[in-house]
């Protein structure tokens, strides 16, 4: 099994160069916000292990929100390059620098402190943002597997009649014929069914250590948390009662720009940024909660679900500016409105845990109640904090997670030597 990883390369944009940068990024697209896989600047399609990638200018439109009687923050505009890949992120970044160095230098030339003649891979590694929490829908599912199983489905579907089968025996016979067909196509090189690579030993060791280490730290801290719980509860409720709500509707022009970049595929992108509420209490609380989110995403939600949500391919949270801001990105199936409704209806409490520490979030009660459940305020809030994703790449356009799961089941259905009539019929229905 090849594990997946994600990365964030982050650099401040040189003042006065943002407009030129956006113009360059626009030349990389074949549709609004949708990267041409073979574009002349950064041909994402040549990287066989890259699932998703994006380039986004993180220009926070909510920095001017006034709350807590604090002066307005003056923070940099960043350029973010993100990627979701097979194998270690370090290797993917090095591969990008080696094979697409010319285009990346053109892009990063708009950033402060970039040396066009220096070691690009080292510069990108030095500008990596640390991910606070990281979600992967199906650990071990590679780009190669997705593409091979997609081709398998198309080849088999073209061979199968849509007419109903008369009997289980007929289903068994058709299944055997299709297995013979696949064997012939694989032998001829027209289909590929590459077996998974061995899982790296280092990955298993790191996963086991993380599995044990985080609970041990929690056990050490537990007595202190119990002693301090009255104070912590008081602080939480006092802040929840007094925190400012800033949830006006999104500016219409900005909303139309976001919508212009959406629904060009069965999947969409989401990039959002916001300021963390001031004070050590909120900073420590959100840091601890994201450790918990990362732990469950790494050890519990690894097979198609994030809590009850099944439509997210990859997502991550990352702090910026010494934890004064938080950026969130995701790649999800379906439309934006359905995506938000899915979260509200299934895991509004999870939204509150992760995001209620942002300035202006709808007021929560006991950390998990209210907040995102107040639908109109939540939807206004998240749209105001969403940023245009200037360039977005998906390695397998037209395929949603439901398709990937179906195609995987089709491949797995080739393996058993004997199946029941009902199993043969169920497998054929997948085609």
Q: What are these regions, as identified by a protein language model?
A:
Residues 1-51, 59-62, 72-78, 84-87, ...:
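Short S/T/G/P-rich N-terminal loop/turn motif that feeds into the first structured element of a domain
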Residues 35-41, 86-121, 198, 204, ...:
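An amphipathic, aromatic/His-enriched active-site/gating alpha helix that lines ligand/cofactor pockets
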Residues 51-68, 73-98, 102-106, 306, ...:
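Elongated alpha-helical scaffolds
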């Amino acid at each position: 099994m090849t594990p997946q990883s994600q990365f964030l390369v982050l650099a401040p944009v040189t003042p006065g160069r943002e407009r030129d940068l956006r113009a360059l990024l626009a030349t990389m697209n074949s549709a609004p916000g949708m990267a041409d896989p073979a574009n002349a600047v950064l041909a994402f399609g040549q990287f066989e292990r890259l699932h998703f990638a994006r380039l986004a200018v993180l220009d926070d439109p909510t920095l001017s929100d006034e709350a807590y009687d604090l002066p307005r923050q003056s923070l940099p505009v960043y350029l973010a390059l993100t990627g979701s890949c097979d194998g270690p992120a370090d290797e993917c970044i090095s591969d990008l620098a080696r094979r697409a160095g010319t285009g990346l230098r053109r892009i990063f030339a708009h950033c402060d402190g970039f040396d066009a003649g220096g070691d690009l891979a080292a510069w990108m590694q030095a500008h990596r943002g640390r991910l606070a929490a990281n979600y992967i829908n199906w650990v071990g599912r590679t780009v190669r597997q997705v593409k091979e199983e997609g081709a398998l489905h198309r080849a088999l579907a073209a061979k199968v009649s849509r007419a109903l089968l008369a009997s289980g025996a007929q289903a068994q016979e058709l299944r055997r014929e299709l297995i013979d067909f696949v064997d012939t196509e694989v032998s001829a090189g027209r289909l590929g069914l590459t077996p998974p690579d061995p899982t790296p030993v280092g990955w298993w060791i790191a996963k086991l250590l993380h599995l044990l280490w985080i609970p041990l730290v929690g056990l050490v801290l537990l007595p202190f948390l119990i002693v301090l719980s009255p104070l912590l509860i008081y602080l939480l409720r006092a802040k929840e009662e007094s925190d400012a709500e800033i949830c006006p509707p999104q500016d219409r022009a900005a909303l139309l720009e976001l919508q212009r970049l959406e629904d060009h595929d069965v999947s969409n992108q989401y990039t959002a940024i916001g300021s963390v509420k001031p004070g050590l209490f909120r900073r420590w609380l959100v840091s601890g909660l994201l450790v918990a989110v990362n732990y469950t995403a790494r050890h519990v939600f690894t097979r198609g679900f994030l809590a009850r949500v099944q439509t997210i391919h990859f997502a991550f949270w990352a702090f910026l500016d010494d934890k004064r801001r938080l950026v969130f990105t995701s790649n999800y199936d379906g439309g934006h409105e359905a995506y938000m409704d899915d979260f509200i209806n299934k895991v509004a409490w999870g939204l509150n845990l992760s995001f209620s520490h942002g300035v202006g979030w709808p007021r929560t009660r006991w950390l998990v109640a209210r907040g995102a459940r107040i639908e109109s305020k939540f939807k206004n809030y998240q749209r105001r904090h969403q940023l245009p994703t200037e360039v977005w790449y998906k390695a397998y356009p037209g395929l949603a997670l439901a398709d990937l799961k179906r195609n995987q089941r089709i491949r797995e259905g080739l393996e058993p030597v004997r199946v029941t009539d009902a199993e043969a019929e169920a497998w054929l229905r997948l085609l």
